[in-house]
């Protein structure tokens, strides 16, 4: 009986040692993975926060932007314009290169009855004031002149960080450093796994644009999902429309390694490529004089 007890104790000790060794093995295996995961999360967070800080730190910028946006019929509409922009208070001068080459837009928040001054560059060659949502100003594009630049982009990211907390960075894949347009860029891909179409009950007098603005959604997407409704049409109380719960399903960014601006943005919905924006000739350091946001500035044709 003593022999059997000793044998049983010995077997238990061997099993305990085996479990202990297996535990050490798992720790050794998983610790580097956990450490690498943590380091990558820190890097992703650092890139995103530096990007937001850089955007918020530059009130005046000038740039040339190329856009390619999917239309309601599935074809892509391209355009290009040059702009001088002040983020706060919002002011922008833009000159079209395509389509509507030579057309100019001047919008100053709170001035001219909050309308944009437009030189359409065609007969009878007079400048007219329009609501910023007017279709002529969009040139068949997705966004109005008030959404140009990076401010909306910054607000979008901040809303997602507030909503998801640190879990937001789990959506992000760090793809490495790439040379793009002769600039070294961090490339990140954001997959919004919970993106979906939902029903929305409208408040009295809301418009599609206001719903998009208040919920950080893509107004063009709402327009396509509700083709019978104009952006500025006032909706009825409890009217049911279809919206998305997030701006995009997937977002690919090339973030300039030097200045941390997202100079190439590729946006996907549930169908595929929805829109992309390319920023070139980005100038972050010049001072734009007040007269440059005036119709009297030399070189403008208002």
Language model feature labels by segment:
Residues 24-32:
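Bacterial N-terminal signal peptides
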Residues 1-4, 17, 27:
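Methionine residue identity
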Residues 12-23:
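Bacterial N-terminal signal peptides that target proteins for export
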Residues 212:
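The alpha-helix within a helix-turn-helix
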Residues 37-42, 47-50, 68-70, 100, ...:
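Non-transmembrane domains of secretory- and envelope-associated proteins
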Residues 2-5, 9-12:
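Acidic, Ala/Val/Gly-enriched low-complexity intrinsically disordered segments
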Residues 43-124, 172-176:
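N-terminal mature ectodomain segment of secretory-pathway/periplasmic proteins
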């Amino acid at each position: 009986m003593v022999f059997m007890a000793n044998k049983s104790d010995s077997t238990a000790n061997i099993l305990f040692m085996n479990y202990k060794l297996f535990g050490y093995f798992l720790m050794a295996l998983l610790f580097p993975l956990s450490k690498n995961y943590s380091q990558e999360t820190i890097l992703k967070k650092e890139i995103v926060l530096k990007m937001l800080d850089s955007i918020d730190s530059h009130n005046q910028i000038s740039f040339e932007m190329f856009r390619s946006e999917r239309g309601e019929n599935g074809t892509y509409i391209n355009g290009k314009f040059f702009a001088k922009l002040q983020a706060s208070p919002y002011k922008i001068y833009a000159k079209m290169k395509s389509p509507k080459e030579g057309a100019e837009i001047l919008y100053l928040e709170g001035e001219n009855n909050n309308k944009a001054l437009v030189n359409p560059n065609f007969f009878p060659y007079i400048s007219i004031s329009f609501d910023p949502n007017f279709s002529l100003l969009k040139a068949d594009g997705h966004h109005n002149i008030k959404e140009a630049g990076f401010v909306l982009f910054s607000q979008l990211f901040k809303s997602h960080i507030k909503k998801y907390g640190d879990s937001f960075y789990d959506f992000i894949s760090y793809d490495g450093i790439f040379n793009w347009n002769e600039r070294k860029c961090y490339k990140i891909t954001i997959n919004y796994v919970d993106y979906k179409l939902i029903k929305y009950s409208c408040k009295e007098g809301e418009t599609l644009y206001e719903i998009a603005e208040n919920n950080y959604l893509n107004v063009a997407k709402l327009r396509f999902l509700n083709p019978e409704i104009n952006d500025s049409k006032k909706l009825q109380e409890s009217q049911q429309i279809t919206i998305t719960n997030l701006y995009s399903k997937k977002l690919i960014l090339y973030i300039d390694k030097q200045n941390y601006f997202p100079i190439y943005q590729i946006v996907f919905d549930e169908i595929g490529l929805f829109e992309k924006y390319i920023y070139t000739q980005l100038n972050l350091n010049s001072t734009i004089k007040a007269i440059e946001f005036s119709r009297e500035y030399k070189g403008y044709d208002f």
